């Protein structure tokens, strides 16, 4: 079995190096690390709507880089800073995952400063034989 790591040299807020891969692929499984609404090493300004769009776009970019699509996502984990954002988050989430809804857990959690949402996921794609 081979293991491929994506984004092992990355920087977070303030340009500090992050000690984990953005995603790891093994045997057809892709594990995407928690993504936030980060752009150029900083959390974007904005409400739950803007941050949810950016966070999901970051997840989709990693999936695409690894050769996966939204249809391959089997599970998502979601952390919301404010549980009152749940229904707003769901309406945006459905725009991206509506055709291929994965299993999902969603919990409230204190987040890093200015971060309103974090999403990780697991995707699976059968290897060509």
Short names for language-model regions:
Residues 1-57, 61-74, 80-129:
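N-terminal presequence-like segments and the immediate start of the first folded domain
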């Amino acid at each position: 079995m081979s293991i491929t790591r994506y984004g092992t040299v990355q920087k977070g807020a303030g340009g500090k190096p992050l000690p984990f891969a953005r995603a790891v692929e093994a045997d057809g499984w892709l594990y995407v690390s928690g993504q936030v609404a980060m752009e150029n090493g900083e959390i974007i300004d904005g409400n739950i709507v803007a941050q949810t769009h950016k966070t999901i776009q970051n997840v989709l970019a990693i999936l695409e880089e690894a050769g996966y699509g939204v249809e391959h996502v089997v599970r998502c984990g979601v952390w919301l800073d404010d549980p009152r954002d749940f229904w707003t988050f769901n309406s945006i989430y459905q725009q991206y995952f509506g055709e291929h809804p994965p299993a999902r857990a969603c919990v409230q959690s204190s987040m890093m400063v200015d971060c309103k949402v974090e999403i990780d996921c697991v995707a699976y794609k059968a290897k060509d034989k």
